[in-house]
From Swiss-Prot:
Presence of keyword Oxidoreductase: no
Paired cysteines (S-S): C53-C69, C154-C158, C178-C195, C204-C228
Family listed: Belongs to the peptidase S1 family.
Biological classification of the source: Eukaryota, Metazoa, Ecdysozoa, Arthropoda, Hexapoda
Active site (catalytic residues): H68 (charge relay system), D113 (charge relay system), S208 (charge relay system)
Entries under InterPro entries matching the protein: Peptidase_S1, Peptidase_S1_PA, Peptidase_S1_PA_chymotrypsin, Peptidase_S1A, Trypsin_dom, TRYPSIN_HIS, TRYPSIN_SER
UniProt protein name: Trypsin
């Protein structure tokens, strides 16, 4: 069911599967951008400093990501790089003190796919590091949005991983519309989800945990989908307004 597994892509991404150990970031048909344009974006890196997921910084020591990103790691195995357009160099590399994923996260249905990371060292805002506000309501269908992450500029045929941050423009598809007959997911789209869609553009293969931003607010967290940039299958995100109260509560506990 997770969208970010290369072998799924080779078999047209059947909507079933197990969680991968590493999730390498991909944006389909995106363009180069800079961290100054998206200073809330961060890459999560494992002990070998390999990129495995994205995230969004929301305060001096808190990063929001996807629950499914965190299943194979302990806090000591994760580092967060902030303030760099290049995923594996520059900026500030910060250790993780603790993290928690949503108690209601279900890897089969992908509901509540959200986690909160507490950094070991607080970071200050700058031109390259900015905290992003959590949206308190889901924008209506058709609202322009942007997804960012690190990865190939095309689907399957690109073998190299660009070091430069990528962005792709999409349109919001709210939960009701995404579950309608206009698209092909049906009842798989649940209340804690929001979708985004643009022809031949998408997040894919491990931009998991990264931001979906509209109106300068964090609207969604990259979660899952059927393949990447497939006609009739929007990208599916954890709906931030639906889990905002959990994020705020957990922020006080970490």
């Amino acid at each position: 069911m997770l969208r970010f597994i290369a072998v799924f892509a080779l078999v047209n991404c059947a909507l079933a599967g197990t969680l991968p150990n590493d999730l390498d970031g991909r944006i389909v048909n995106g363009v180069d951008t800079t961290i100054e344009a998206h200073p809330y974006q961060v890459p999560l890196q494992n002990a070998a400093l390999s990129h495995f997921c994205g995230g969004s910084i929301i305060s001096e020591d808190l990063v929001v990501t996807a629950a499914h990103c965190m299943q194979s790691y302990t806090a000591s195995q994760i580092k967060v790089r902030l303030g760099s357009t290049i995923y594996n160099e520059g900026g500030e590399l910060v250790s993780v003190k603790a993290f928690k994923f949503h108690e209601g996260y279900n890897p089969k249905t992908m509901v509540n796919d959200v986690a909160l990371i507490k950094l070991a060292t607080p970071v200050r805002e700058s031109s390259k590091i900015r905290y992003i506000r959590l949206a308190d309501r889901t924008p209506p269908t058709g609202t322009p949005a942007v997804v960012t992450g690190w990865g190939t500029k095309c689907f399957l045929t690109c073998v190299s991983l660009p070091k430069t941050l990528q962005e792709v423009e999409v349109d919001i598809v709210d939960q009701k519309a995404c579950a309608s007959n206009e698209f092909k997911y049906g009842s798989q789209i649940q209340d804690t989800m929001v979708c985004a869609y643009a022809l031949k553009k998408d997040a894919c293969q491990g931009d998991s945990g990264g931001p979906l931003v509209a109106n300068n607010q964090l609207v969604g967290i990259v979660s899952w989908g059927s393949g990447c940039a497939r006609v009739g299958y929007p990208g599916v995100f954890c709906d931030v307004p639906s889990v905002r109260s959990w994020i705020e509560k957990t922020a006080k506990e970490l």
